[in-house]
Amino acid sequence: MYLLQLLFWIRLFRGIWSIVYTGTSVTLSTDQSALVAFCGLDKMVNVRGQLLFLGDQTRTSSYTGTTEILKWDEEYKCYSVLHATSYMDCPAIDATVFRGCRDAVVYAQPHDRVQPFPEKGTLLRIVEPRVSDTGSYYIRVALAGRNMSDIFRMAVIIRSSKSWACNHSASSFQAHKCIRYVDRMAFENYLIGHVGNLLDSDSELHAIYNITPQSISTDINIITTPFYDNSGTIYSPTVFNLFNNNSHVDAMNSTGMWNTVLKYTLPRLIYFSTMIVLCIIALAIYLVCERCRSPHRRIYIGEPRSDEAPLITSAVNESFQYDYNVKETPSDVIEKELMEKLKKKVELLEREECV
């Protein structure tokens, strides 16, 4: 029973472990702001969460908006548009954003390895994660009629290990193109300042991609990949040597990798360890209090019987035992005399009747 109570409290504290990012138009709820995965070992990376309307984030009867997934590469100071979807005529039926929309158009999807699956509660999914997928990912949400957009950032770290090697050539990483920008802070301000479809409103991006929009249903998964014609303005890193002459990075000897893992996993490990210790202490205090509150009562078995002791030894009737040494009271003497007089009078009456 106590084990079940302990598991209940652990699950309760685990259930409230959620991060909420509040924007001007929408709110993002997720259970993780950073992920660490290993190439070859993890076949898929999922960032769980959902977009919500909370608090005073007002809504009309219907709305239109866009969601984009972008990646920032800190090493090369560039960003990539990984996925973008435009939603039209979405009814405000509940707190979930972009649910039950009349139509949705995917207008940017360079490859199908990075996709959102909002109907499954997945903000971002990376299939077959690679070392080049490491970076800061942004989910940008823009609603029509608003003067700014909301961006939500999360970190994804992919490393190779000694036991599980990445079987991706260096050329495969170069296929992922980037667009130069000043720095990450300027890039975030750039995203917030744009309203509406990022690719449609940005002339530079619109010139880079030849968009072929495809209408899809909001009830099915987005799996199509439109064609893109890359122009010369795209920044493609000329030196992207992740393997160091095709030799895999040994995660066990990588100081930076261990620092990253400790940075994101150690706080959670300390949190859960502390909660388990507190639950054990609370359980021990509860058991001690229960034992002190309901002690074992002693059973009365009476005093040892002697020859001169009365026969009554019950704990209940102990106060009613007869004491043979107690003298008669005056009332007892009067009653005795009355009884004797009454007896003599009865005998006298019987004699008179006989005569």
Swiss-Prot record:
Highest taxon of the source? Viruses
Q: Which GO terms describe its cellular component?
A: host cell; host cell Golgi membrane; host cell junction; membrane; viral envelope; virion membrane
Question: Which residues of this chain are annotated as glycosylation sites?
Answer: 147, 167, 245, 253
- Could you list which ranges are Intravirion topological domains? 290-355
Function text: In epithelial cells, the heterodimer gE/gI is required for the cell-to-cell spread of the virus, by sorting nascent virions to cell junctions. Once the virus reaches the cell junctions, virus particles can spread to adjacent cells extremely rapidly through interactions with cellular receptors that accumulate at these junctions. Implicated in basolateral spread in polarized cells. In neuronal cells, gE/gI is essential for the anterograde spread of the infection throughout the host nervous system.
Which N-terminal residues, if any, form the signal peptide?
A: 1-18
What protein am I looking at? Envelope glycoprotein I
Query: Which keywords belong to this entry?
Result: Glycoprotein, Host cell junction, Host cell membrane, Host Golgi apparatus, Host membrane, Membrane, Phosphoprotein, Signal, Transmembrane, Transmembrane helix, Viral envelope protein, Virion
How it assembles, according to the record, is:
Interacts with gE.
Where are the bilayer-spanning segments?
A: 269-289
What's the family? Belongs to the alphaherpesvirinae glycoprotein I family.
Tell me the compartments it is located in. Answer: Virion membrane; Host cell membrane; Host cell junction; Host Golgi apparatus membrane
Q: How does it sit in the membrane?
A: Single-pass membrane protein; Single-pass type I membrane protein
In this entry, the parts of the chain located on the Virion surface side of the membrane are 19-268
